[in-house]
Amino acid sequence: MFLTNISCLIIPILLAVAFLTLVERKILGYMQLRKGPNIVGPYGLLQPIADAIKLFTKEPLRPLTSSKLLFTIAPTLALSLALTLWIPLPMPHPLANLNLGMLFILAMSSLAVYSILWSGWASNSKYALIGALRAVAQTISYEVTLAIILLHSNLFSGSYSLSSLITTQEHIWLIIPSWPLTMMWFISTLAETNRAPFDLTEGESELVSGFNVEYAAGPFALFFLAEYANIMMMNALTTTIFLGPTYNPTFPELYSTNFMLKTTMLTISFLWIRASYPRFRYDQLMHLLWKNFLPLTLALCMWHTSLLISLTSIPPQT
């Protein structure tokens, strides 16, 4: 039964990820006044299936000087962690309703750093290693603000469980009282998932595609799937924390529809940003976090904490 539950979670995610690649190529195409994929199947709808067949039937080449074990483990670990992150998300019922769901997501997203680092180091290529070090520095840095903003949402909901956020947002979305945090969270999720304009790990001109430069065929496809699964997961988490869909026990399907629509809109905005903005310089990326986001999030954290303490002695207005 448990295996059925897991497969019912994993298969739709992988299908959504496959078609997200098509949506991205279509959006980028239309924004550049061209069609995008339109040959394979009607309107190019079978393009993801053709891509999957092509990638998984090619021979997975490996550099002779690479570390065989780590080179193989890294993409598998990346996809496994990307799928594990979906476990505590309420849609409206999570696969496992964890009391510390927020901390679980934070810990799992931190572990994703290892797959990037191992892939860069095991490739035994200086381009891959520099790309991996960039990615690790960027991911670890932006996790700081993500953790502080998660602490804010914990202050609002009074629990580390993600399911409690549904109850918290019955009357008002958290985006309204905490819109500066939401903006910083959204930009931090862009950086955390290595998306444009923060995709410095893939600097084609200087790093030749970054940490996955030596990967081909199946292992490359696993990294690709992990990246897009992380994008969708981060947007699903943003929806849960700041745009809480209304849960009606008599119509639980409405929650799922609402949740999926909001997640889709946020994901399309990710793609829109990629098509619109140029890449940041590395020092600008780090200055944005350490000199702007970190002081702001800490100040807002102190403000929200002190606000709760200062209002505790005030009687309720009945």
Curated annotation (Swiss-Prot):
InterPro entries: NADH_UbQ_OxRdtase_su1/FPO, NADH_UbQ_OxRdtase_su1_CS. GO terms for biological process: aerobic respiration. It is a multi-pass membrane protein. This is NADH-ubiquinone oxidoreductase chain 1. Core subunit of the mitochondrial membrane respiratory chain NADH dehydrogenase (Complex I) that is believed to belong to the minimal assembly required for catalysis. Complex I functions in the transfer of electrons from NADH to the respiratory chain. The immediate electron acceptor for the enzyme is believed to be ubiquinone. The chain crosses the membrane at residues 2-22, 36-56, 69-89, 100-120, 130-152, 171-191, 217-237, 254-273, 294-314. Its EC number is 7.1.1.2. Its main location: mitochondrion.
